[in-house]
Design a protein with these regions (language model features):
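Conserved acidic
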Residues: 1-7, 19-591
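Histidine-centered metal-binding segments
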Residues: 628-640
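Thr-biased low-complexity repeat/linker tracts and other Thr-enriched repetitive architectures
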Residues: 579, 583, 587-602, 606, ...
């Protein structure tokens, strides 16, 4: 007889903030399918006793934080890490970039059946802060917040207010997850849910045929052509106060490319030398060596990562006397030839692909329809489904993870686990979707060359207040792939990528603030965009003090200490940046880290190199969050 499906719970800890006394002072859990079954208590031992007997699936929002307390407890209570599912051991999925996905605690076996409780990260399924989930999903949310710095000795009695907040937090996640599960979205991450939904539509059989599993060797070559979004500040405006201007962004930029552009499928054919046109294999990735100089009046589009000679986040005006070695999709190569003069070009080899349009049509039609005809939770889920798919195609097959252990000082440390690989999904798709995204943004920006201030992935910022001719026929607030006129500003100042301020024209309509224009506004909204800056620090920013070197000691930094994790205030400084940098698509995750603004210092070197686009990677790029864990390369880690 098949046993009952496992129960699922939403859980949360409240913890002390002292390095020398780091512990859980409150826990809460709530049954995701029956909100009347919940408990809030003040002892981690009591919580863990429940965990060990409940044999359920638990969800914490931001497992990296709460999970650190759990593993501290397990290590101190006779449990050892093991990948083999032995009794009284626990296993983890923690990527080498320090992304936490799972803790699986094994108590033993009943016959063949494993007796275990598994803990997941709801943040991977709903990549937003709890308050934003409550807003977007139209769930009730308690006003106010817990006072995190209040003295709370061991055995502290939870106040009625605190009790209410904890209950509210676990209930929001419980409600949101229940809606997801009811939609059949039961995978470990939003990206996996999205890929599963896509496979359901085109069928697994067709998926395998259209997107064959490439060898790790081929995948590695294709991946060299994978890049993130185009994020570039025009030197002409750097650090200067600018007058009126406007911002446009593409509605659902990546889904729009997936909907209409020519995209690769099938097994590639390897070729030597230069690609020769082949109507059966119209797309290609070319390995070239060359020197290059930017043409007069053109935006730079080439960025070289992992090189000794070039800054990884700068768009280059010249190869600077070195011979550049590049792997480029034909989309990027054509753009490069249009923007640069190339010298001493050597075409080495490449891969060519069959291509088609419309593979994603049914999937995007389905979820776009749901998005436009729903509100609240279902609308948000539809957005998540649409925006999480492209990143999955380029998931990194190297899933070597981290293994936790207790260090001499009693805090958690992490060592690299054994090398581990999984099958790639279909990286060429990721390469071309992101390439078409860059192409769309860069061609629009180039057509407005005399006005372009800044680009970020799917947006262009221009001087002046007239809609440029080049996009005037494709401006629309909602249509897929059209440019939305996002805002008009009175003045602005840009320091580097993802670091700018604007005074935006707003008008009050029936009590709400909506976008205004120079001839029609009632309010000016001061907007601060600055990767890694907390809301508290943003309140300190003015047009006068917003410059390179601006610094405040107010940024919470997460540190592993005996017992768990504490947040300590560290210094946040605006550093002088290059004129460009790869960052990636929207992915909701950005917003989450925007909201959290937490750096993790976990010993080891000073943080990894940065990879190409892939949902997660690029948003780390975007956030400039340093997770100091001393290993290179960004990874996308997905098991189930």
């Amino acid at each position: 007889m098949k046993h009952m499906p496992r129960k699922m719970y939403s859980c949360d800890f409240e913890t002390t903030t002292k390095v020398e006394d780091c512990r859980v002072w409150a826990y809460g859990y709530m049954n995701i399918e029956d909100h009347s079954e919940y408990k809030i208590g003040n002892s981690l031992d009591e919580f863990m006793a429940w965990v060990l007997k409940v044999q359920a699936d638990l969800y914490f929002h931001n497992l990296k934080f709460d999970g650190s307390f759990i593993i501290n407890w397990l290590e101190r209570n006779g449990f050892k890490w093991s990948a083999d599912g032995l009794p009284n051991t626990y296993n983890t999925i923690i990527s080498r970039m320090g992304q936490w996905y799972m803790i699986d605690i094994c108590l033993g076996y009943k016959g063949k059946r494993k007796i275990h409780t598994v803990i997941y990260d709801s943040l991977k399924k709903l990549p937003f802060p709890v308050k934003k989930i409550a807003q977007d999903f139209k769930l009730t949310v308690k006003k106010g917040d817990i006072d995190y710095h209040k003295e709370r000795p061991v055995g502290y009695k939870i106040t009625p207010e605190e009790y209410a907040y904890i209950k509210n937090d676990i209930q929001i996640i419980a409600e949101a997850l229940l809606i997801q599960f009811k939609q059949g979205l039961d995978r470990m991450t939003a990206g996996s849910d999205s890929l599963k939904g896509f496979k359901d539509i085109i069928t697994t059989k067709k998926f395998k045929k259209v997107f064959p599993t490439l060898s790790l060797g081929l995948d590695k070559e294709v991946r060299k052509a994978y890049r993130g979004g185009f994020t570039w500040l025009n030197d002409r405006f750097k650090g200067k106060e600018i007058g009126e201007g406007m911002v446009f962004d593409i509605n659902s930029a990546y889904p729009a490319q997936m909907y209409s552009r020519l995209l690769p499928y099938g097994e590639p054919i390897v070729f030597e030398g230069k690609y020769v046109w082949d109507e059966d294999y119209p797309l290609h990735i070319q390995h070239i060596r060359c020197e290059f100089e930017l043409k007069e009046g053109y935006i730079p589009t080439i960025q070289i990562k992992q090189s000794l000679f070039y800054k990884g986040n700068e768009y280059l005006k010249s190869s600077g006397g070195e011979i550049a070695d590049l792997w480029l999709s034909n989309v990027d190569l054509e753009l490069m030839k249009e923007h640069y003069d190339l010298y001493n070009v050597e075409y080495i080899s490449g891969l060519k692909f069959k291509a088609t349009t419309g593979l994603f049509k049914d999937f995007i039609d389905k979820w776009s329809y749901i998005k436009t005809t729903s509100y609240g939770a279902i609308k948000q889920l539809a957005k998540l489904m649409l925006n999480s798919l492209y990143g999955k195609f380029a998931s990194n097959p190297d899933v070597t993870g981290k293994v936790p252990y207790l260090k001499e000082n009693g805090a958690l440390g992490f060592r690299l686990g054994e090398e581990e690989y999984k099958d790639p999904v279909y990286t060429p798709m990721g390469v071309f979707i992101t390439a078409w995204g860059r192409y769309t943004t860069i061609t629009a920006a180039q057509a407005c060359y005399d006005r372009i201030i800044y680009c970020d992935t799917d947006s262009i910022h221009l001087t002046g207040t007239k809609i440029p001719d080049v996009i005037k026929d494709i401006v629309h607030p909602k249509k897929l792939g059209y440019w939305e006129h996002e805002s008009t500003f009175k003045r602005a100042k840009y320091l580097r990528q993802k670091t700018y301020i604007q005074d935006i024209y707003m008008k009050r309509v029936r009590g709400y603030l909506v976008q205004g224009s120079p001839d029609d506004y009632t309010d000016i909204k001061f907007s601060v965009k600055c990767a890694g800056m907390t809301d508290k620090i943003k309140e300190e920013v003015t047009f006068e003090n917003f410059k390179v070197g601006f610094s405040r000691k107010m940024k919470p930094k997460a540190v592993q200490v005996p017992g768990g994790v504490v947040l300590v205030d560290s210094v946040f400084t605006i550093k002088g940046g290059g004129s460009g940098g790869g960052s990636g698509g929207g992915s909701g995750l950005n917003d989450f880290f925007e909201a959290q603004k937490i750096e993790w210092h976990e010993g080891g070197g000073s943080g990894g190199g940065s990879g190409g686009g892939s949902g997660l990677n690029d948003f780390f790029e975007a956030q400039k969050i340093e997770w100091h864990e001393g290993h290179h390369h960004h990874h996308h880690h997905h098991h189930h």
